[in-house]
Amino acid sequence: MSKHIVILGAGYGGVLSALTVRKHYTKEQARVTVVNKYPTHQIITELHRLAAGNVSEKAVAMPLEKLFKGKDIDLKIAEVSSFSVDKKEVALADGSTLTYDALVVGLGSVTAYFGIPGLEENSMVLKSAADANKVFQHVEDRVREYSKTKNEADATILIGGGGLTGVELVGELADIMPNLAKKYGVDHKEIKLKLVEAGPKILPVLPDDLIERATASLEKRGVEFLTGLPVTNVEGNVIDLKDGSKVVANTFVWTGGVQGNPLVGESGLEVNRGRATVNDFLQSTSHEDVFVAGDSAVYFGPDGRPYPPTAQIAWQMGELIGYNLFAYLEGKTLETFKPVNSGTLASLGRKDAVAIIGANSTPLKGLPASLMKEASNVRYLTHIKGLFSLAY
C-alpha cells in the first residue's frame, strides 16, 4: 500500500526532506505532499540583500514548482491552521484536511517580541521576501520624504538586534546609503543608521577580535551602535531604551529574536520552550511518526546545549530526515544525526565580512570572508539544483 508523507514548510529542512526522500521512494511506493505558505523557497540568509535592493527577488525566492519539477512531489500552497499528531491530521486554512503515515514539521520560527509594549505594532521584520521588499520600499520612501521635509525622524533608521540578521542588514543599508541619498539630493551623512542591542556586544557567536573588526568596519561607514541597551517600550516612532534615552525613528526594523512557531506547541508534540524535542534520529520524542527539522526542532548536542537554529543545521536535518522517513516506514535501521558546523559567516555589506570557518574555527575577515559567504550560498543552491536563481 502506498504511504503518504506530508511535509509542513518548504524552508531548508522541508525542501531537503522532500528532495531526499524521493531518492528512496518511487511515486508508486509513497506520495509526498509539501505544504507551504508561499509558492517560493526563500533563502532566508540572503534576505538582507533584498532589503537593501542589492539583488532581485528571484535570487532569494525560488519557485517551488521549478525546484520540485519532475520529482513527483505534490505541492500545496496553503497556510497550516493547525495539526494534531494524535489524530494524524493537518488542517489547512482553505478548509481542507490532510492525513499522513509520516509527518515532517519544518514550520520555521516566528519573531519574538519578548512582551515589550508597542514593539510588534510599531516595527517591521525581516522574515520573508515580502518583508524585505517592504523594508527597502519604506527606507527609500523615508529618504525621499526627508529630502522635502528635513524631518530628522525620516533620516533615522534603527535596527533592533545585533545578531546576524541585524548586523547584515545594517551593513547592506550602509553600503547603499550614499547612492540612495544622492538620488534624492540628500547628503548621506545626514542619514543616521543606528543598531540597538540588549546584550553587551554584537555578533556574540563570534570571537571578540572579529566583533571589534565588524564594529570598526560598520562605524567607519556611519553606523552607530547602542549596545547593552534593551528596548523597553515603543510608542509610534519613539523607541525607549533602558538607560532612559529615546530614539525617534520613522524606520524601525526588529530582528532581535525568534521563537518556535506556535502551531508546534499546540500540536500535541512534546516541546521545550516552544520547539519540538527530537531524538538522535530527528523523530519527535513523543511521536515516532513525526520528524522535525530546522527552527521547529530543538536538538541537544553532547554538551547538553541546543544546536543554534541555523540554515546549515536545517539543511543537514532535512537530508537525514529524507532517509529516515524511508527507514522508519520500511522498518529499516534509522541513521543518527551527526551535524557538521562548517562555520559562521557575517557579511558587512557588499565587500566586507567576518567569519569563523571549519572545525578549528579559523577566523576570516575582509574579502576572503565575503567570498566564503558567497560560496556558501552557491554551494547550497547547487545542492538543491537552484542555480537558475543566480541567473537573475
UniProtKB/Swiss-Prot annotation:
Cofactor(s) needed: FAD
Class of the enzyme per the UniProt entry, highest EC level: oxidoreductase
Record keywords: FAD, Flavoprotein, Oxidoreductase
Annotated InterPro entries: FAD/NAD-bd_sf, FAD/NAD-binding_dom, NADH-Q_oxidoreductase
Annotated GO MF terms: oxidoreductase activity
Induction, per UniProt: By glucose starvation.
EC annotation from Swiss-Prot or TrEMBL: 1.6.99.-
Top-level taxon in the UniProt lineage: Bacteria
The UniProt record lists the keyword Flavoprotein: yes
Keyword check for Disulfide bond: no
Alphabetical list of PANTHER family matching this protein: 64 KDA MITOCHONDRIAL NADH DEHYDROGENASE (EUROFUNG), APOPTOSIS-INDUCING FACTOR 1
Family as reported in the entry's similarity comment: Belongs to the NADH dehydrogenase family.
Entry protein name: NADH dehydrogenase-like protein YjlD
Source species of the chain: Bacillus subtilis (strain 168)
